[in-house]
A protein has these predicted regions:
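Short, Lys/Arg-rich flexible segments
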Residues: 2-217
Length: 217
């Protein structure tokens, strides 16, 4: 028996599963018996539209709460729409800390780096690894605050591990500025409830569309 939409949380994110409850599906059972293919198509479209709706609203909500560019949040959201005979779709949201250089337009100032309303005093914007500049700070700096550089552990080898760079030379070690997304985790349950309501609305619309086509045929 389907309990409707639900979510599962993991260390690195959360997976929302969008599906109709048994009670909702029962209401459309008679129509489904008459035109099963049309009903299945309507159900599939309703779930996929709900996934798109949920992705948009989660991106906006997290963007407002964490002061992160919507485009950066969307990169953490991955939709798995309904295909074939599946009865559910999924939306994955990665909650690992995001590089501060990705949340807006970073700007080097005389005292550090500013981006999306945040200021990293003593930091600098530079391409150290990869092909894009990031926001770094020397861990020996008096301005270094571990809260601004989450998910960082010192690596013993060459190159970045999870935000730190440990190498020989006066420039190192460095820590990369990141923004934690853990504050978004508690919102999953409320998003699932809203998604259930939206799915029911869309399912009614899509079934009505298929019904009108059936009556005209």
């Amino acid at each position: 028996m389907s309990v409707g939409s639900y979510y599962k949380s993991s260390a690195g994110g959360g997976m929302v599963t969008i599906q109709s409850s048994s009670a909702d599906l029962q209401a459309f059972q008679d129509f489904a018996k008459v035109v099963p293919k049309a009903a299945a198509a309507a159900h599939r479209r309703a779930i996929n539209k709900t996934l798109g709706w949920l992705r948009t609203h989660i991106a906006r909500a997290v963007s407002r709460q964490e002061r992160i560019a919507v485009a950066a949040v969307r990169q953490r959201l991955r939709s798995y729409p309904v295909t074939g005979g599946a009865m559910s779709g999924k939306l994955w949201f990665g909650l690992n800390a995001i590089e501060s250089s990705r949340i807006g337009r970073a700007r080097q100032t005389g005292s550090g780096v500013s981006v999306a309303g945040r200021r990293y005093q003593g930091a600098f914007l530079k391409q150290v690894y990869g092909n894009k500049p990031d926001i770094w700070i020397r861990t020996a700096s008096k301005h270094f605050d571990a809260d601004d550089y989450p998910d960082s552990t010192v690596s013993s080898g060459r190159g970045p591990s999870s935000g730190w760079v440990a190498e020989n030379g006066s420039r190192f070690p460095l820590a990369k500025a990141k923004v934690s997304l853990e504050q978004a985790r508690p919102h999953f349950e409320s998003w699932v409830g809203k998604a259930d309501e939206r799915l029911l609305q869309l399912l009614q619309q899509e079934l009505n569309f298929e019904l009108q086509k059936y009556l005209r045929s």
